[in-house]
């Protein structure tokens, strides 16, 4: 399971303040703790913390790389911000570009730009593509699958290996009116997306979005994560500091026959996957 740690994001108060103060220690401590907690990638998102998003993402990347070699996930839907981050990143460790819709009303070719940047960054550069187009986030299963199919088709046309492609089916907050049917629609879409190519694209979600504003956030996230893994999900942007959630990842590996059973399977998983 590929876990993308979510906390280095300017939407969080401590990170926003660290960016404003240029406090490297806060960012570096977060990067170390997320790595130690089992992160495969560290998400790096300026959020609303700075007007100069290009300069800020470069500062974040350089700050993290001073003390940490965990691959980074550059998180912005602005191609110029991603390009700025790529100028200073060590892509040999691996990098994930997060993320592009299929297209936007203001930019029909945005997907092509992200594929080009991923290709230029090297063979260890992967790409997250959203099942979203110029009409926004789809509300039904069939449209999600159709957009995913077009994403896969366009990637293959450009010679982009589908093993480097992550399809994000976009989870919405379950608390939002009329959104409670969406988790079921997403699971049904996952059932089909995993068959769109051979090899199949990865599937990922921004897990914490599901429980935004809700009570029992960790419980909601854990249950849906287990359900989605059973449908083929192999990646999530998530809170690696939620140990109960990480235990779901470990147990899912066991039940999906990716780990040999032992009475100490959680300990074994942690020893292998945590820094």
What kind of region is each of these model predictions?
Residues 2-6, 40-44, 70-75, 93-99, ...:
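Hydrophobic faces of well-ordered beta-strands that scaffold small-molecule active sites
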Residues 3-29, 53, 98-106, 136-142, ...:
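Active-site mouth loops of central-metabolism enzymes
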Residues 7-16, 35-45, 128-135:
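Gly-rich Lys/Arg/Thr-decorated short loops/hinges at beta-loop-alpha junctions or inter-strand turns
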Residues 25-33, 37, 146-150:
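A non-catalytic, amphipathic alpha-helix used as a structural packing/dimerization or gating element
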Residues 25-26, 57-104, 108:
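Active-site cofactor/substrate anionic-group-binding motifs, chiefly glycine-
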Residues 35-70, 171-179, 183:
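Glycine-rich, proline-tolerant flexible connector loops at the mouths of alpha/beta enzymes
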Residues 53-61, 82-89, 114-117, 142-144, ...:
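Distinct, well-ordered alpha-helical segments
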Residues 106-109, 113, 119-273:
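Catalytic alpha/beta core domains of metabolic enzymes, predominantly
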